[in-house]
């Protein structure tokens, strides 16, 4: 285990908390008030049971960061509430719980390359590619003259995810989505 100060903890890090459990960091934000002690608020998910917790630490407080191995895998198929991935190097299959995949589940596509973080040979976290391409299947019709405005409208993708898209984007358009926060990035160029 490596020791890191709270201010250096980032999304995706695996830390061992004071209760002896491993947690994956979902979000870490530092706050530096004009007066008082700077703090870091860390939102994390306990690996053993998937429970989310939010803790606030002094930015100089030391936390134990677990050594995890990044292993490239390929997504194969869903299996009930779980997902099956194949190790790209040795072709071994690994089953990952739906709780671990979390909000990224709708973005999984067959043969999609992902990175699994492994701790003692077990998957503890997953990293999806930063971009996902999908087709819009439902949205309001395109209104002439709104191509340059900053207004957005709701749309539903082929995987069922609801997003906000610019007013000029219509049904059948392929768009690129940010997998971290589910926001529209741009039209696909294919």
From Swiss-Prot:
UniProt keywords, alphabetically: Cytoplasm, Elongation factor, Protein biosynthesis
Compartments it resides in: Cytoplasm
UniProt pathway: Protein biosynthesis; polypeptide chain elongation
Q: Which CDD domains match?
A: S1_EF-P_repeat_1, S1_EF-P_repeat_2
Q: Give GO cellular component annotations, separated by semicolons.
A: cytoplasm
Gene3D superfamilies in UniProt: 2.30.30.30, Nucleic acid-binding proteins
Q: Name one Pfam family in it.
A: EFP_N
An example Gene Ontology molecular-function term: translation elongation factor activity
Q: From the UniProt annotation, give the residues forming the signal peptide.
A: none
Q: Name one GO biological process term.
A: peptide biosynthetic process
Per the record, the similarity remark reads:
Belongs to the elongation factor P family.
What job does this protein perform?
Answer: Involved in peptide bond synthesis. Stimulates efficient translation and peptide-bond synthesis on native or reconstituted 70S ribosomes in vitro. Probably functions indirectly by altering the affinity of the ribosome for aminoacyl-tRNA, thus increasing their reactivity as acceptors for peptidyl transferase.
Name-wise, this protein is: Elongation factor P
Q: Which organism's genome codes for this protein?
A: Hyphomonas neptunium (strain ATCC 15444)
Record gene name: efp
